[in-house]
């Protein structure tokens, strides 16, 4: 975190749970979490440790929480939605101020749900009950920016290459884009006649993929490449989210 601050970054977003369903905090909702690992003899809490480090060094803290969970046996049922809302509540309650909550638009598909290989489909527009999610966030973290394909706080830019359109409006037409249903070109440029303020966020990895592999350490982006990404994201009226 000290390195992030020295690099001039404004905030850190931690992937608290990705699609695999493993939780980096000692959640009380599932055994599939850091509590049941050798890390710090089962007493570790990476979410808590990072939140504390961000507070120490004066940088904003945020979390990514995947709606899709390829581990939970009840994914695709109403019971899972309740579970997901409770996960969100834990994260929004126990770790101080959160400046952004990041919801991935990848939802439904193949997984090992409850240990059985299966494929699940959902109604992406209605399944997660986003109105209820927004109520939880308004109550527990009213200042938090909500990221998804369509906002409402900020939107995905429609690609994972780290750049926005040369013309990139901060508006969307309300109701035309929603989480899990991206309109790639429209997200890249926004709507000039939009009536909802939803600025774009450009996500890109500093290495070839999203996850760490030691053999890729000599393939990280160069200063020249990163500078170009900065100009094509921040310089195109968007924020830049750089994955490490």
Located regions from the model:
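Mature catalytic domains of secreted/periplasmic carbohydrate-active enzymes
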Residues: 1-244
């Amino acid at each position: 975190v000290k390195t992030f601050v020295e690099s001039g970054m404004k905030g850190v977003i931690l992937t608290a749970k990705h699609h695999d369903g493993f939780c980096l905090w000692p959640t009380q909702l599932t055994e599939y979490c850091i509590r049941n690992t050798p890390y710090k003899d089962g007493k570790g809490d990476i979410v808590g440790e990072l939140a504390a480090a961000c507070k120490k060094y004066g940088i904003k803290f945020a979390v990514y929480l995947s709606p899709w969970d390829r581990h939970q046996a009840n994914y695709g049922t109403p019971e899972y939605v309740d579970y997901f809302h409770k996960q969100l509540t834990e994260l929004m309650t126990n770790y101080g101020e959160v400046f952004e909550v990041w919801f991935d638009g990848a939802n439904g598909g193949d997984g090992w749900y409850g240990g059985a290989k299966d494929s699940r489909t959902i109604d992406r527009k209605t399944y997660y009950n986003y109105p209820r999610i927004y109520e939880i966030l308004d109550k527990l973290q009213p200042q938090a920016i909500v990221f998804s394909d369509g906002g409402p706080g900020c939107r995905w830019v429609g690609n994972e290459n780290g750049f926005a359109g040369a013309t990139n409006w901060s508006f969307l037409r309300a109701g035309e884009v929603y989480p899990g249903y991206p309109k790639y070109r429209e997200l890249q440029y926004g709507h000039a006649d939009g009536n909802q303020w939803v600025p774009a966020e450009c996500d890109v990895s500093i290495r070839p993929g999203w996850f760490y592999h030691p053999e890729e350490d000599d393939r990280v982006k160069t200063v020249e490449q990163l500078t170009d990404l900065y100009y094509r994201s921040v310089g195109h009226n968007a924020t830049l989210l750089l994955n490490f």
